[in-house]
Regions:
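Short amphipathic alpha-helical segments, especially helix-boundary/capping motifs
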Residues: 1-2, 24-26, 35-38, 88-93, ...
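Contiguous mid-protein beta-loop-alpha structural module that forms a pocket-lining wall or clamp
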Residues: 93-160
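Generic detection of long, well-ordered alpha-helical segments
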Residues: 14-18, 51, 101-105, 109, ...
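Solvent-exposed alpha-helix faces
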Residues: 22, 55-56, 113
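Short, helix-capping/interhelical loops that line the mouth of catalytic, cofactor-
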Residues: 1-12, 59-116, 120
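Short, contiguous alpha-helical
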Residues: 36-81, 130-182
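An N-terminal domain-cap segment
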Residues: 2-52, 61-63
Length: 182
């Protein structure tokens, strides 16, 4: 029996994650590939690199809801590359090399919708595995929102666009305070 069927309430943080994802989608939809190849201020990543990174970790967030084993099967090859001294970009390349920037943008958006759907219907207190310490589903989707918002800001900055934030970013502020010592 699903969480919502036994009286659970939808996880509002999932909807907030989707708001930040949607603002990025609306900023980039219809742009040509040259925009996705622009270098951001973050480690010389391109806008396309950012979407690749967000996509990979959206997939990881869905895999961990399925099971710890699914997460490990997906994430361990990335972790091995990181432990061998590779960068995140180098570690994620094998997963993304079959997509051009525009295809990657579209699958990132689809993965964002999937994260929202899966986490909306998950018990917020469910404990799930991650690369760092285990966390609640609520913390996991808030971390996805935080990463989407933060990497999104580098895209807004690079394109000279103004972002209109709202109260939904309070989740990010709470997460920052709660994890400051960690």
């Amino acid at each position: 029996m699903g969480f919502l069927r036994i009286g659970g309430k939808k996880l509002e943080q999932a909807a907030d994650f989707l708001k930040d994802s949607k603002s990025l989608y609306e900023l980039m939809v219809g742009r040509n590939v040259s925009d996705f190849r622009k270098i951001t201020q973050f480690k010389n990543w391109t806008i396309g690199d950012v979407f690749g990174h967000l996509y990979v970790f959206n997939i990881a967030a869905v895999k961990t809801l399925e099971s710890s084993a699914e997460f490990d099967n997906f994430f361990n090859p990335i972790l091995e590359k990181l432990q061998a001294g590779r960068s995140f970009l180098q570690a994620q390349t094998p997963l993304l090399k079959h997509y051009d920037e525009l295809e990657l943008f579209e699958i990132w958006w689809e993965s964002s919708l999937d994260v929202n759907e899966k986490y909306s219907n998950t018990d917020p207190k469910k404990r799930i595995k991650w690369a760092g310490p285990e966390m609640s589903a609520r913390s996991s989707v808030t971390a996805r929102q935080m990463e989407t918002w933060a990497h999104g800001q580098e895209i807004f900055d690079r394109l000279g666009a103004v972002r209109n934030d709202g109260d939904h970013i309070q989740n990010i502020i709470h997460l920052g305070v709660a994890t400051f010592g960690w």
